[in-house]
């Protein structure tokens, strides 16, 4: 349904000037934490998780161990369980943490209802999940070192060349 309003940004990597700063814009971005360089994040949006080859696969192969999904997945009977299985399964397949933030209260319309099913998964295990149709914060600790160690241990996990991805460095106050 997003194709009614958007076009694919796959393979698009440009720079834009926003408030006087040059900012990378595109789908192939890896966000590397300066204080914890083992933490590498990437993003996908909503239905990316539901397609046959989600962008998170390429992000993980390029080194991302934290995938964030900014979603607006509407509610239907049984969809919450299916969505949970997708998040859990993707984090298991990619040996990564997967943070899923769904549209919620105040974002529904007469056409669609959003329940705000927010989740954090690590290597196939749902670590935290918010209650649907309630506002709140979902948080959990993620063991990035364990994920990286598991990737090195597995012979089935195949990293790929990351030259298609631009690394954007960021600062995180770690206490």
What feature does the model see in each segment?
Residues 1-175:
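Enzyme catalytic cores with a strong preference for nitrogen-chemistry domains
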């Amino acid at each position: 349904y997003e194709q009614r309003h958007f076009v694919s940004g796959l393979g698009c990597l440009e720079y834009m000037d926003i408030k006087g700063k040059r900012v990378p814009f595109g789908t192939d971005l890896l966000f590397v934490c300066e204080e914890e360089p083992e933490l590498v994040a990437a993003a996908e949006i909503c239905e990316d998780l539901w397609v046959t080859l989600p962008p998170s696969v390429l992000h993980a192969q390029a080194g991302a161990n934290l995938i964030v999904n900014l979603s607006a997945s509407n509610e239907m009977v049984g969809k919450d369980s299916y969505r949970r299985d997708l998040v859990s399964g993707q984090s298991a397949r990619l040996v990564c943490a997967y943070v899923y933030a769904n549209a919620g209260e105040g974002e529904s319309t007469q056409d669609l209802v959003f329940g705000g099913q927010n989740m954090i998964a690590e290597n196939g295990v749902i670590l935290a999940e918010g209650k649907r149709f309630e506002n709140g914060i979902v948080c959990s600790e993620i063991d990035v070192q364990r994920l990286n160690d598991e990737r090195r241990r597995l012979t089935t996990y195949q990293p790929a060349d990351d030259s298609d991805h631009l690394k954007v460095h960021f600062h995180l106050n770690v206490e």
